[in-house]
Structure formats: structure tokens, C-alpha cells
Design a protein with these regions (language model features):
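Solvent-exposed interaction patches of small proteins and small membrane subunits
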Residues: 41-45, 66-70, 92-97
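A generic structural signal for well-ordered alpha-helical surface patches
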Residues: 80, 96-99, 124
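Amphipathic alpha-helical segments within well-ordered protein domains
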Residues: 10, 80-83
Length: 136
């Protein structure tokens, strides 16, 4: 299940003309703040780009942190989209986001299949971290 905030972002993206979609992706990339000092990030080795993630649960809400080089705006945009879903949601809602949540919304035209597999791996890594946080 795709959380409402993420679904709304995906629907907006799908409704835009193709020439505006890259602009919207860059806006999502710009929304990704640097992780706070001391947050231990895990590298997503399946990604070609150095992509580091961290998820935890505080106050019943999922918190997500990312580090993506500025030289990788499409990967950073995907991180920005991920923040629209599991971040701030209940752990259960975050765990329900399917790895291929982006399919059918036009994102396939912006990411290569190899990159999409890496980004799906990032979501799965985040979900594993949420599960671990729930059992700690």
C-alpha cells in the first residue's frame, strides 16, 4: 500500500507534461536535508551511486535520513520521493510500501532499470531498518 502523501506526489508527477517532470524531480532532490551529525548511515551497495540511508522509529513515526551526492540528482530525487511516503508515517504504513511503488506513474522514463533495482534495494534496506528499530 502506498501512503497517501506519496500517492499524491506520484499522481501529481504522472499528471504533469513530460517537460515539467524533470523540474519536479529536481524539486524533490532539493528537499532532501543532510543527515544530522551522529546518525549512522548504511550504504546501499546495489546502487551505482554512493547512496546511504538510515531509518528509525521515534514517537510511533518513521524517520528517514539520506546522504546522496549532489552530483546524483535523480537518485537524490528518489530519496526525496521516499521521504513523502514512509517518513512521518506509522511503522506499519512504512513497511507496506511495495518496492515497485513507482510503477505506472511515469518514473520509469527517468531511471534506468539498473538504477531502479538499486532504488528498490534502498527501500527494502529502509524497511529492514524499521523492522529492526521495532524489535530493539
Amino acid at each position: 500500500m502506498v501512503p497517501p502523501k506519496l500517492k499524491q506526489a506520484l499522481e501529481l508527477f504522472k499528471s504533469l507534461p513530460k517537460e515539467l517532470r524533470s523540474q519536479v524531480l529536481l524539486e524533490y532532490a532539493a528537499k532532501v536535508p543532510p543527515p544530522p551529525p551522529g546518525v549512522e548511515l548504511e550504504r546501499v551497495h546495489e546502487c551505482q551511486t554512493p547512496f546511504f540511508v538510515h531509518a528509525d522509529v521515534e514517537g510511533g513515526k518513521v524517520r528517514l535520513y539520506f546522504h546522496v551526492p549532489d552530483e546524483a540528482p535523480t537518485v537524490k530525487a528518489f530519496a526525496g520521493l521516499l521521504r513523502e511516503g514512509p517518513a512521518g508515517a506509522s511503522p506499519e504504513a512504512g513497511l507496506e510500501v511495495p518496492p515497485g511503488f513507482y510503477r505506472g506513474y511515469g518514473l520509469e522514463g527517468f531511471f534506468t532499470p539498473l538504477r531502479l533495482r538499486g532504488l528498490e534495494a534502498a527501500l527494502l534496506r529502509l524497511q529492514a531498518q524499521v523492522r529492526k528499530a521495532l524489535t530493539s
